[in-house]
């Protein structure tokens, strides 16, 4: 059963619309659906709400520590409420999936994502669930003939807003993720994964 849903992103209005904040977009939607208000909670270093989602009580968290220190926020809340790693779902932007794709996964490496890296270090575990929201990779924007030897600027890419057509399909993928949340919060993660990956 998932007891904590974390959205990853960077704090501040200048980052709100950037690709790196896709995790925040999902948690914002969940809070809206539940009629919950995310409030600044200093002891958890983030915006926090306790919400009732599909009949289950769930903690929602958006760390306000900047991406590479997200673990500080997650471990503060998880320790306080005695939540185990496999009861945590972290929603984050995923470079290795094209825009419009969303996947659920338990455990694994960070794939170069600094937020995941820090969470794994603070939890001393990689065995938490991830909701991977595809944003594409900057190499995909380089014409095929010019890709050899090209060094895509990943840092710049994730800190820019998606193009209009990308935003539309990312929004649609978040809607698909929201549709499986009743299963997620009840602990039916395998069923949720199958449904999500079928689309």
Curated annotation (Swiss-Prot):
Catalyzed chemical reaction(s): an N-acyl-L-alpha-aminoacyl-tRNA + H2O = an N-acyl-L-amino acid + a tRNA + H(+)
Site (Discriminates between blocked and unblocked aminoacyl-tRNA): 10
Residues annotated for tRNA binding in this entry: 15, 66, 68, 114
GO molecular function: peptidyl-tRNA hydrolase activity; tRNA binding
CDD domains xref list: PTH
GO BP, sorted A to Z: protein quality control for misfolded or incompletely synthesized proteins; rescue of stalled ribosome
InterPro entries on file: Pept_tRNA_hydro (IPR001328), Pept_tRNA_hydro_CS (IPR018171), Pept_tRNA_hydro_sf (IPR036416)
Purpose: Hydrolyzes ribosome-free peptidyl-tRNAs (with 1 or more amino acids incorporated), which drop off the ribosome during protein synthesis, or as a result of ribosome stalling.
Subunit annotation: Monomer.
Localization per record: Cytoplasm
One Pfam family in the UniProt entry: Pept_tRNA_hydro
Record protein name field: Peptidyl-tRNA hydrolase
């Amino acid at each position: 059963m998932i007891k904590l849903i974390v959205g990853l992103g960077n704090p501040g209005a200048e980052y709100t619309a950037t690709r790196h904040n896709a995790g925040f977009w999902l948690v914002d939607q969940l809070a809206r659906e539940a009629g919950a208000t995310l409030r600044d909670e200093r002891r958890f270093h983030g915006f926090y709400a306790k919400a009732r989602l599909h009949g289950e009580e769930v903690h929602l968290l958006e760390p306000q520590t900047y991406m590479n220190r997200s673990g500080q926020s997650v471990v503060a809340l998880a320790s306080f409420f005695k939540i185990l790693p496999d009861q945590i779902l972290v929603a984050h932007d995923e470079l290795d999936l094209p825009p419009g794709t969303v996947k659920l996964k338990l455990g694994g490496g960070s794939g170069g994502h600094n937020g995941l890296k820090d969470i794994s270090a603070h939890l001393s575990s990689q065995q938490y669930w991830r909701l991977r929201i595809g944003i594409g990779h900057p190499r995909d924007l380089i014409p095929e003939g010019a890709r050899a030897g090209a060094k895509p600027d990943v840092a710049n890419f994730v800190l820019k807003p998606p193009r209009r057509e990308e935003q539309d399909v990312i929004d649609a993928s978040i809607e698909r993720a929201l549709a499986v949340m009743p299963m997620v919060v009840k602990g039916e993660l395998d069923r949720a994964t199958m449904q999500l990956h079928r689309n």
